[in-house]
Amino acid sequence: MPSDTSENTPDTINNLNRRYQDEDADIILVASDGLRFRVHSYQLRAHSSVFRSMLELCDSSHEIILTDDDIEASDIVCLYLDLSMGHEPDLEATGMVQLGIRCRRLGDFLAKYDAASAKQTFIYALYRWVELEIVSSERVFVVAARMDNRDLCIAALKKGLSWEWKNVASSDEETQAGYAGHSIFDLSAAPLWMIKLTPPTYTLALMRQCRKIGKGMSNEVKNGVIQGFRIELDLLKEGTGGDSSKGIDI
């Protein structure tokens, strides 16, 4: 969840918005927690069709006020601007679980604002982060599924298929927990947040492979799981007209 920013005032400047205080900027983005980012309208127009439309329709106001406490808080606005403007996000103080949750929220923000170029940069970053174990594989899988990116899901599977849960099941997205000793991609052992946040088409495609997933899997078995997931997902998407967010007719 977003960090506690109840002390924010119109004058608050901290590590999240300090980079975005250009005195020549003509737009102020006000995050849902009140933190303000001074940016140029041409930058918003260039990177988001939704912001472009908002700026065309707005009156003389120089503020865009964001209200969604989950995906429009200051930490997500900061990440979005970093990706859009070519800055390296500051991840030093972010733990693996919190960064995974933040990635899910950022992915939803990019979808809401149709930010195509930032989304592509984000996808490249996720490939790197999952490989370097900066973000855990199951978190990347969920984010990739929500962005309908099969190849990134497969990269997450390849990296983490042998990883096991160490805690008990939980529905809390902030508690990285599943049934101990089971693969993080065995959905019968997955925490409820993982099931809830993964689109149904991706859930079913992975579920069909769970009978193969277990301790001491050989590379041949792992490759079979990944190939099976790829085939099942393609078949399921044919049945939904390519829209993975739709329900599945069985």
Label for each model-derived stretch:
Residues 1-92, 213-250:
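BTB/POZ (also called T1 in voltage-gated K+ channels) oligomerization domain detector
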Residues 26, 96-97, 130-131:
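Leucine-rich repeat
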